[in-house]
A protein has these predicted regions:
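Catalytic core of pol beta-like nucleotidyltransferases
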Residues: 1-22, 30-36, 47-132
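A short beta-strand element within the Helicase C-terminal
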Residues: 38-40
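Short hydrophobic/aromatic beta-strand micro-patches
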Residues: 43-45
Length: 132
């Protein structure tokens, strides 16, 4: 995996600061399509994230002390559950194709259960998810 050491350094910083329930690499790197100019999309689920989205992004970006092009996105555990329930493409991609870097076992089971419910209502197409 490109930037492996940098990614793991970032993961450790996030774990110390935000006590996440889930950390997942998604996007091109998870699908094996990483190339020149690609970034490293990391989904972070933590109930310690601020409600304000701009403050949330600032914290997530400031935790990256590496040269890796990390593009973090962060959600609370309830926000992420709602995203899965509604068939949000980012959430579905992260669960379907993602590489789990860290997980709370109980939370991951909840997420997988929700995903199984939703996967019966959507279908994966070449460029995204569609309702069936």
């Amino acid at each position: 995996m490109p930037y492996y050491e940098d990614i793991m350094e970032y993961v450790e910083r996030v774990k110390m600061k935000l006590k996440p329930k889930l950390l997942v690499i998604f996007g091109s790197i998870a699908k094996g399509g990483f190339g020149v100019g690609s970034d490293v999309d990391i989904l972070i689920v933590s109930d310690m994230l601020p409600k304000n989205f701009q403050k949330r992004l600032k914290i997530l970006f400031l935790l990256n002390d590496t040269f890796a092009p990390i593009e973090p996105v962060g959600y609370t555990s309830e926000e992420f559950k709602k995203m899965i329930s509604k068939g949000h493409p980012t959430a579905l991609d992260a669960i379907h194709d993602g590489i789990i870097l860290y997980k709370d076992e109980k939370y991951e089971k909840e997420i997988r259960s929700l995903f199984k419910e939703v996967i019966g209502r959507v279908r994966r197409e070449e460029f995204g998810w569609v309702k069936v």
